[in-house]
């Protein structure tokens, strides 16, 4: 278990001590998606979902989730985020409506924001599902994945085009 930083000498979980790490700018981008039927797509676009503006509420949920990631993920450090942005893009093909979600997170600190970006993308997708499930419970969420991250000891990461979903 030597290779895992989240275990102590007894093999039990611990939160990693980051006090000696350098303060640097850290960024991360994660993506998710929600596949919906035509009725849901048209109602979201037309502002006809009874619970309200789906994309506005989902966007706020994503920002809130990023800010509260350490409450959800046990070994995540509480971070002071300097920016969170949630964006949407529709992909429409014949009888196929896919809402692409991108969550970008930024901080200046001692640890990265990958989990915050992934949590934001996930919570955004879950909120879309929650607000539309009365119409169709067959929506499909995902895949959810890290696109890129910058900063830190381990350097930058960018998912290759062959790894992209």
Swiss-Prot record:
This is Cyclic pyranopterin monophosphate synthase. NCBIfam families: moaC (TIGR00581), PRK09364.1 (NF006870). Gene3D superfamilies: Molybdopterin cofactor biosynthesis C (MoaC) domain. It comes from Halalkalibacterium halodurans (strain ATCC BAA-125 / DSM 18197 / FERM 7344 / JCM 9153 / C-125) (Bacillus halodurans). It catalyses: (8S)-3',8-cyclo-7,8-dihydroguanosine 5'-triphosphate = cyclic pyranopterin phosphate + diphosphate. Its EC number is 4.6.1.17. SUPFAM superfamilies: Molybdenum cofactor biosynthesis protein C, MoaC. The keyword Lyase applies. Catalyzes the conversion of (8S)-3',8-cyclo-7,8-dihydroguanosine 5'-triphosphate to cyclic pyranopterin monophosphate (cPMP). Homohexamer; trimer of dimers. One of its GO terms (biological process) is Mo-molybdopterin cofactor biosynthetic process. The gene is moaC. HAMAP family: MoaC_B. GO terms for molecular function: cyclic pyranopterin monophosphate synthase activity. The active site is at 130. Keywords: Lyase, Molybdenum cofactor biosynthesis. Substrate binds at residues 75-77, 115-116. Belongs to the MoaC family. Pfam families: MoaC.
